[in-house]
């Protein structure tokens, strides 16, 4: 029997929700964090190692995959799931954010965007229909609408024009979308930090009708307080039985605040990028493994983590790997950071189901504000004598 795409609520605390996202490629507990696999790979990770962190869904990118290796090639090779060895759900970004970030390399009109590849300068064209067709060729479980992402800050009239163009494009994306059991298309809510424009965008998208709704155009320099205010004004307007996705967010603290405001899905390059630059997320904040203080530290990154970096290796070894520019360092820290993000999401889900999110959130924030574990709190392991 085919699976209908749907989000089913399990529990609620205030505006925070726990539930399950049912798709053609499996069921994903929410709230969930999606590791970013832009070009068909989560950087520095095998897909087995991504699975081992507890991730249930990953993200790919239309812009990058259309340029290399090409959507039709991916289709001919069995689709993105087979190509990258990920049988679970895949959400593909539409390419809009990347194209709009090209600056002088792109030209926007009412129909779409013409741009030059950042790889070889070749000319390409993306329209709502073309973006949707590419995502279909990739066999994305969740297809995103093609939208314009204006740089902030910008005058309200500029944001309004951009949002209304994105809404017209959303209608064209919906027309081009090929419905299939267990697959979905999400509309993207725009409007900057203007509550009235966000409300107008929600009305336009719900009038078209999508399986899910994303909140775009945030985490672009507006600051956490304004981001939260925008979520407070926007999230309650989204249909309660639809999944809600906050695009490109964020830090652990951002995730917690957004979950408290009713968001279900997230993606961000932070944990993987941090791992490649020697930064490790922990319950006590962020560690920089290049710092000399770790050079002789035999302890793991965190006493609470069961990733390979923490169960098999010391801070001293990880410090050495980065000082020696060994590729294993970024691999192990990326693994650790993704494991931390998934553990963070599991903890929030469990607290929502248990009805204890308030206390759980207070505990998370209190520990993030603390210093690194002392040797008394996390003693070094006993080392065998050197023969």
UniProtKB/Swiss-Prot annotation:
SUPFAM superfamilies referenced in this protein's UniProt entry, alphabetically: tRNA-guanine transglycosylase
GO terms of biological process kind: queuosine biosynthetic process; tRNA wobble guanine modification; tRNA-guanine transglycosylation
GO molecular function: metal ion binding; tRNA-guanosine(34) queuine transglycosylase activity
Paired cysteines (S-S): none
Catalytic activity: 7-aminomethyl-7-carbaguanine + guanosine(34) in tRNA = 7-aminomethyl-7-carbaguanosine(34) in tRNA + guanine
Positions contributing to Zn(2+) binding: 305, 307, 310, 336
Ranges for region RNA binding: 248-254, 272-276
GO CC list: cytosol
Catalytic activity, EC: 2.4.2.29
Keywords: Glycosyltransferase, Metal-binding, Queuosine biosynthesis, Transferase, tRNA processing, Zinc
Catalytic residues identified in the record: 93 (proton acceptor), 267 (nucleophile)
The protein's required cofactors: Zn(2+)
Binding site for substrate: 93-97, 147, 190, 217
Pfam families: TGT
Cofactor note (record): Binds 1 zinc ion per subunit.
InterPro entries hit by this protein: ArchSynthase1/Queuine_TRR (IPR050076), TGT (IPR004803), TGT-like_sf (IPR036511), tRNA_ribo_trans-like (IPR002616)
Pathway this chain belongs to: tRNA modification; tRNA-queuosine biosynthesis
NCBIfam families for the chain: Q_tRNA_tgt (TIGR00430), tgt_general (TIGR00449)
Family affiliation: Belongs to the queuine tRNA-ribosyltransferase family.
Subunit details: Homodimer. Within each dimer, one monomer is responsible for RNA recognition and catalysis, while the other monomer binds to the replacement base PreQ1.
Function: Catalyzes the base-exchange of a guanine (G) residue with the queuine precursor 7-aminomethyl-7-deazaguanine (PreQ1) at position 34 (anticodon wobble position) in tRNAs with GU(N) anticodons (tRNA-Asp, -Asn, -His and -Tyr). Catalysis occurs through a double-displacement mechanism. The nucleophile active site attacks the C1' of nucleotide 34 to detach the guanine base from the RNA, forming a covalent enzyme-RNA intermediate. The proton acceptor active site deprotonates the incoming PreQ1, allowing a nucleophilic attack on the C1' of the ribose to form the product.
Protein name per the record: Queuine tRNA-ribosyltransferase
